[in-house]
């Protein structure tokens, strides 16, 4: 490497290229992004902010008097909402929000992960590709965004689109292909 000029040395005086600080704080987000096939770090950061807001709301509710009717009403409302979204496994207690409402819980409700859970796809990356190509619908709506969060009530309505070649191939394999569907 060449010797740096005076103005370059002044600019890089506090930078050491040989012993840089190893930042191990991002290993968790890299693991979550890889496991759930999140392509953009901004999505992970949004999920992290949402989890922080859940925790903040739960903490503020816990500061109120335990017999306060406002606290009881909104605790039940928050627990029910998070359970219906699929983020919490049960609507039992507020401490579950601190322990179990995390980024992974939100990522488990993404459409590609639900497709793998329903055995529509073997891996999350393949499910993401199929969603982006428009092969999947939730209810009557065709979804092309892999970041779509599926609630517990909509989980039963995740199917292939009517025009999808995958649906036709599955019906042909199961001997349920109707001649009317070929039109």
Swiss-Prot record:
PANTHER family: 30S 40S RIBOSOMAL PROTEIN, U3 SMALL NUCLEOLAR RIBONUCLEOPROTEIN PROTEIN IMP3
Gene from which this protein is expressed: imp3
Keyword Nucleus: yes
GO BP annotations, alphabetical order: ribosomal small subunit biogenesis; rRNA processing
Organism of this sequence: Schizosaccharomyces pombe (strain 972 / ATCC 24843) (Fission yeast)
Keywords recorded for this protein, A-Z: Nucleus, Ribonucleoprotein, Ribosome biogenesis, RNA-binding, rRNA processing, rRNA-binding
Family of the protein in this entry: Belongs to the universal ribosomal protein uS4 family.
Protein name: U3 small nucleolar ribonucleoprotein protein imp3
Highest rank taxon of the organism: Eukaryota
Transmembrane segments: none
The organism's taxonomic lineage, starting at the top: Eukaryota, Fungi, Dikarya, Ascomycota, Taphrinomycotina
Signal peptide location: none
Alphabetical list of PROSITE patterns matching this protein: S4 (PS50889)
